[in-house]
Amino acid sequence: MKHLLTCLFFCSILSISHLTQAQTLNNFSLKDIGQSVIITMDGNGKMVNLGVDMENYGSPFFDPEFLPANIVLATGQRYENVLIKINLLSNEVIYKTPEGKELAVLPAIKQVELNKNGEILFFEYGFPVYEKQNHKTIYQVLAKGKVSLLKYFFIQVTEAKPYSSATMLRTIEQFPRLFLYDQSLSLKKAPKSNEDLLSLYKADATKLQSILQKNNLKIKKEEDFIKCIAKLNEN
């Protein structure tokens, strides 16, 4: 399968390199892709140095394994069957080179189609600001249409030094949070009950009520929430 060609910009922590010749993803080199940032912020705005040697519990990655994916850049250019991991802490897509290097792809990305055990999972950037989240925050798209159901992963990092131990312990926890994005072009924290959903979308309340009742859905269950929004978007 042929890869699309493009001129891309990539940067490392200490320097920025300009790719002057179109290349496929299969022959990138270290000068073309910068390393993933080591110092970053957790969900509380705390600086986290992932380069420090510590005993770690938990992971900032959506999946710790490299999985095949298609990447669509903000320019519309598409790359297929790339091995990646998604760093939910730094909001980066980490690309694995043929030489085994793990590097961050830093050009603006619009969408990632991640293949996990045959199931295609969609992730997108570019949503409005909500508290500490911005257009560079990555969301998993659970349902998309006139109303989109999004999942944001709040990452909390805690560090502690146990009594009489010389080793620092770092715990990385993921807290999924659901959001709705609609034609008002704003992010809304997803309601947790059927009643609150009907109150939020009063114009579609009759339609939503019918969907909820006919399918016996309770949106406090994520799978039911996904079905509800998907059916709303069908009409």
What is each of the regions a protein language model found here?
Residues 168-170, 181-187, 192-208:
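Extended, compositionally simple fibrous regions characteristic of intermediate-filament-like scaffolds
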Residues 18-58:
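Sec-dependent signal peptide cleavage junction
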Residues 62-188:
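Aromatic-patch recognition
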Residues 198-235:
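Long, compositionally biased interface segments
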Residues 1-26, 228:
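Bacterial Sec-dependent N-terminal signal peptides
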